[in-house]
Amino acid sequence: MNTRIELITPIITEGVRSLAEVQPFERADLTVTHSLIVQGPASIESEFDEALSVPDTVRKAIDAERRGANAIIIDCMGDPGLHACREVVTIPVLGPCQTALHTAGTLGHAFAFVTVLDRLRSMLAKLVASYGLSDNYACFRAVDIPVLDISHNLTSLNAALAREAIAAVKQDHADVIVLGCTGFLGCAGAIRQGLLAQGLDVPVIDPIPLAIHVADALVKTGLSHSKLTYPPPRRKAVAGYRFPEFADGGKA
């Protein structure tokens, strides 16, 4: 069975995500396509940014299923609009954060987030709690690099990420590292080498590749989200949004 996964980047900034970055994970039976929202924030670094990103992310999810996607991944560690998207489509929708955190629980007892900015600390702690994993949360560490600056100096970025990962293991007793921004795609190898150089054999989870393979597994095993948990929205009056499918009488 061929799987087509739609990667939805929930920001409006072009060039942040390239299909070339995910092509190494494609196979003859697995294709990844990509879309960017057109209404929302330039980046997601706060609850406010996340709220702005959700409506068009949901719209893109509906459109992706109509175009034949078999699964959807929301390309942000805040998992914006995850539950709403699951309500409006029938195919699997994965949040890279939820996927990474539950996988971390199978690889160790205490995970650490290594992410972009310290201001995300409470936002990610709330997300961890919502996924029922607070007892497994070792620590939060940030490299103080805004999302849109990630690609400016990858050598410096990798060094900073490795430094924080080592500190998370040595000082906070983390035994799994979770990259806390999907913009860090491709950095896991360098961080792992930095850990090994310190004698620390600790797994480093790169959320997007993991989500791609989990989504593919769900599709190939015929699994998707329970509609008892994620029932379709009831039709009602809707103003200011492009959701005729769920507006009263089918009209926005």
Place the predicted regions along the sequence by residue.
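Short, acidic/small-residue loops that bind anionic groups at enzyme active sites
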Residues: 86-107, 191-212
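Short, glycine-/small-residue-rich phosphate/pyrophosphate-handling segment
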Residues: 105-143, 152-156, 216-252
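Active-site rim beta-loop-alpha module in soluble metabolic enzymes
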Residues: 128-182, 187-192
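Periplasmic-binding protein-like
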Residues: 66-76, 173-182
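Glycine-rich, highly charged phosphate/nucleotide-binding loops
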Residues: 46-63, 156-164
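N-terminal glycine-rich anion-binding loop in soluble enzyme alpha/beta folds
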Residues: 1-55, 116-154, 247-248
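Extended, histidine- and acidic-residue-enriched regions that form the cofactor-binding/catalytic faces
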Residues: 9-10, 166-199, 214-218, 229, ...
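Conserved beta-strand elements of the Class I
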Residues: 6, 111-114, 175
